[in-house]
């Protein structure tokens, strides 16, 4: 999030952008979204497993539907845990690959000077105020929305091409 905050603050104040690239920010935002969705899937499928097992073992309902629900929920739970663990390990590996200089540079961007201009004060302390952290979250959500919108645009283009070729 610090990366996205630095890039967008730099673009607004018009100096040269730091070493963070927009693709790194998009990758971080996508990883965060996948982590959040897989965590939600783990909780949802786990709770569905518990509820269906409780109904199944209480003996008050038909066995087959709840048995199917239980097996499907358990399969979803296992898959969601696998996805969650893979993404967590990817995030940990990307954090380990970052050098200490990059981490310090991200923590203290006011020390860096490029092309004679200093970065703006709001990017110099990205954690100083709640508005800067909100700005980072807003930019991450905006990039996710742009990615989803671009994907839907591509799907619509493909659908329109296939319709025009089918006639």
Curated annotation (Swiss-Prot):
It is found in: Secreted; Host vacuole, Host pathogen-containing vacuole, Host pathogen-containing vacuole membrane. Residues 97-136, 148-167 are annotated as: Disordered. The modification Phosphoserine is found at residue 166. The keyword Membrane applies. A motif (Phosphorylation-dependent binding motif) lies at residues 161-166. The chain crosses the membrane at residues 37-57, 63-83. The keyword Membrane applies. Phosphorylated by chlamydial kinase Pnk1. This is Inclusion membrane protein G. It comes from Chlamydia trachomatis serovar D (strain ATCC VR-885 / DSM 19411 / UW-3/Cx).
């Amino acid at each position: 999030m610090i990366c996205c905050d630095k890039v967008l603050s730099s673009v607004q104040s018009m100096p040269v952008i730091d070493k963070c690239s927009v693709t790194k920010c998009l990758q971080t935002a996508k990883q965060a979204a996948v982590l959040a969705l897989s965590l939600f899937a783990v909780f949802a499928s786990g709770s569905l497993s518990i509820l269906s097992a409780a109904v199944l073992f209480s003996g008050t309902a038909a066995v087959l539907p709840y048995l199917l629900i239980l097996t499907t929920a358990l399969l979803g739970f296992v898959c969601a845990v696998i996805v969650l663990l893979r993404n967590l390990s990817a995030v940990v590996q990307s954090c380990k690959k970052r050098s200490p200089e990059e981490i310090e540079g991200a923590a203290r961007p006011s020390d860096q000077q490029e092309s004679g201009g200093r970065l703006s004060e709001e990017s110099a302390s990205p954690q100083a105020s709640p508005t800067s952290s909100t700005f980072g979250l807003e930019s991450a959500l905006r990039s996710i929305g742009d990615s989803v919108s671009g994907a839907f645009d591509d799907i619509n283009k493909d659908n329109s091409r296939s319709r025009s070729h089918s006639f």
